[in-house]
């Protein structure tokens, strides 16, 4: 169940970035064929394999031109948040379907859909480059402060690998995922 849930989550995540960017005035994702729900436009199979093996991976990132976005700074933050928000909403929908269906049938797929999409949501909200959370932080902090954290762009992947290997990333994502599942249980 993990692989189909992951492909769906990555596809919706990147589509949401592309859709938000185009709606905010940047034609780049449309010109690159990224405003589609076709997984082949968004999936990087090495990134999917890493996610299955390590608990984190990547899809093909959507390229944007921030200068084309309405409300340039805030537009960039909205585009960055569109992906994690779509994963959170998809996780909620999957949880609701899992809760409504009898054990067996498709319930396992929807349970994995909820957990995988929560992982994608919370992983991408971390303020470490190249993740979406860093794009939001970059917009929010003053330029002089940004220079103090710019070095992160060079070492972001290394930081994520180390956090994953020592188990910190798994604990943080697991705690966030558990809290969201409890929230869904109260709602549904």
Spans of features found by a protein language model:
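Hydrophobic transmembrane alpha-helices and their immediate loop junctions
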Residues: 1-188
């Amino acid at each position: 169940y993990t692989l189909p849930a992951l492909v769906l989550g990555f596809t919706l995540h990147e589509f949401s970035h592309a859709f938000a960017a185009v709606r905010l005035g940047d034609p780049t994702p449309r010109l690159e064929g990224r405003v589609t729900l076709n997984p082949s436009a968004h999936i990087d199979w090495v990134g999917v394999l890493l996610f299955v093996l390590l608990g984190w991976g990547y899809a093909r990132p959507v390229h944007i031109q921030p200068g084309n976005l309405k409300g340039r700074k805030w537009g960039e933050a909205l585009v960055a948040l569109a992906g994690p928000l779509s994963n959170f909403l998809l996780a909620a929908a999957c949880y609701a379907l899992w809760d409504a269906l009898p054990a067996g049938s498709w319930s396992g797929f929807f349970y994995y859909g909820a957990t995988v999409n929560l992982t994608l949501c919370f992983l991408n909200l971390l303020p470490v480059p190249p993740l979406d959370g860093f794009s939001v932080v970059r917009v929010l902090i003053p330029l002089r402060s940004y220079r103090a954290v710019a070095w992160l762009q060079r070492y972001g992947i290394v930081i994520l690998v180390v956090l994953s290997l020592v188990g910190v990333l798994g604990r943080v994502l697991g705690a966030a995922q558990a809290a969201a599942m409890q929230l869904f249980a109260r709602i549904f």
